[in-house]
Amino acid sequence: MIEFFFDCSSPWTYLAFHNIQPLADELGVEVTWRPILVGGIFNTINPTVYASRETPVPQKARYLKKDLADWARSTGLAIKMPPTVFPVNSVKAMRGCVWLGNDMVPFARAIFEAYWGEDQDISQDSVLTHVCQRIGIDPAPFFAGIGEQAIKDQLKANTDEVVARGGFGSPTIFVDKTDMYFGNDRMPLIREAVLLSLIHI
């Protein structure tokens, strides 16, 4: 019913990751979690993101900082923007989500918290080790797993798929495969779309 394409390197994705779970629980539908590399999307079809980071519009940048703080307060999440390391290389973390499969949600949540709430560099093996230990994952098979070619290929395939389906960033959310939404602030529309879909089942 709901597909959630995500990269933990985005604060807006952290908000959406947090907010979509109670929405899905309320409506009795499942979320299919699809890890991606948002940098791969930017490199392929949305390179203007890099230009806007290099030469931001001051007024817009100030407002975006306020907007993020407002959403974080409303959601009850601690988000430091920008983190000390930004942008961050999230490839190992996102491969970890792929490797964990149906068990990825606690790991993804811990990665979001480590990066956005605790200002830890999630590109570092030491941080990933700590995150694994915190939630009861053995680091040794974790690091072996994320090095497997099949895991690397699946992460790339997820990223290529969301682009092919019209996505341009993270989070990209689909209801019933074709109805696409982008961003945390689309939750009311996603809720309406799911309700309409349930009516027509």
Which residue stretches match the model-derived regions?
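Structural alpha/beta surface segment adjacent to cysteine/selenocysteine redox centers
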Residues: A16-E118, A193
